[in-house]
């Protein structure tokens, strides 16, 4: 692990020793952070992609918005109750949320909450096997195109509990200067995200 990873882990240890990490549950979510690098463009003939000024950044669709975003994605596990970020992973923006979900789970929390993008039957079984309550929102599928009323209610209840993560992202972007990735490359993007998360946790601890 690099220096910043060690610093984050040490801060996490001190927060835990101070009794500030409650372990009631982990709230998982991700946010796209645009890069300040110029977007690559496509040539008119042959649709060949021009060289990107940041080869590690990637495109992704904006949820609930038109168009696309170009940059990185910060995936976090937030301790319910304290609001402290105790797990963080940074990836290119096109990495699906569920890919890194298991890295955001501590293993000793009472429950794991997230939207339906994180739900898989395998993850549900794995959480149950570890004695962790699965509070992952459900989504319709080909076998069940319309969710049962109890699952719709379940989703609404989980959505209310995990709404605090949106406040976390708003604080990181608006108050902690994480609205844009200012450096080129995944390693430096990870460093910027980690620095902001460390500052966020220290501010909550103060």
Describe the function of each predicted region:
Residues 48, 110-111, 116-187, 191:
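Helix-centered, glycine/charged polyanion-binding patches within enzymatic domains
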Residues 187-189, 196-206:
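Charge-patterned, long linear interaction tracts outside catalytic cores
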Residues 1-133, 139, 195-200:
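Polybasic low-complexity intrinsically disordered regions
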